[in-house]
From Swiss-Prot:
This is Large ribosomal subunit protein bL17. It comes from the Bacteria. PANTHER family: LARGE RIBOSOMAL SUBUNIT PROTEIN BL17M (PTHR14413:SF16), RIBOSOMAL PROTEIN L17 (PTHR14413). The keyword DNA damage does not apply. GO terms for cellular component: cytosolic large ribosomal subunit. Part of the 50S ribosomal subunit. Contacts protein L32. Belongs to the bacterial ribosomal protein bL17 family. InterPro entries: Ribosomal_bL17, Ribosomal_bL17_CS, Ribosomal_bL17_sf.
Length: 162
């Protein structure tokens, strides 16, 4: 029966699964992108997204909670300093899973899981919006007319043939 099976056990005992997810989460936070199987990527997504949400509020309590899951002070520091600064305005969905095909050795479905805001290819098209200020009742200042420099004229000296 399938009662009470809320998440994928990944064919591992609880301690092994928790250690594996903690190591994968530390690698994801450090490298911003890792390759793994689809099942592990989905389990990692459920594991790491609440931690990223907690990192948006930098308190000692949240740091201790994240450290209890990650078990690496370097990953916690990186999470609260770099990752939280980038995802501060995003309401959720901090990771993206991209399927890569099958592994040659055992034909396992492979995927790449990455932090969304750290991919320059997908986010490269976004530009800062330039706000124009509108004034009520008055005209905007006109730009001063620019005077163009006179064109460089070269004097040609012609020596007549004698």
């Amino acid at each position: 029966m399938r009662h009470g099976k809320k998440f994928n056990h990944l064919s591992r005992q609880k301690g092994h699964r928790a250690a594996m997810l903690a190591n994968m989460a530390c690698s994801l936070i450090e490298h911003k992108r890792i390759n793994t199987t689809v099942a592990k990527a989905k389990a990692l997504k459920q594991f790491v997204e609440p931690l990223i949400t907690k990192s948006k509020d930098d308190t000692t309590h949240n740091r201790r909670i994240c450290f209890a899951y990650l078990r690496s002070k370097y990953a916690v520091t990186d999470l609260f300093r770099d990752v939280a600064a980038k995802v501060g305005d995003r309401p959720g969905g901090y990771t993206r899973i991209i399927k890569l095909g099958n592994r040659l050795g055992d034909n396992a479905d492979m995927a790449m899981i990455e932090l969304v805001d750290f991919n320059e290819l997908y986010n490269g098209g976004k530009k800062e919006e330039v706000k124009t200020k509108s004034r009520r009742g008055g005209k905007a200042k006109k730009a001063e007319p620019t005077t163009e420099a006179p064109a460089n004229t070269t004097e040609e000296t012609t020596d007549s043939a004698e």
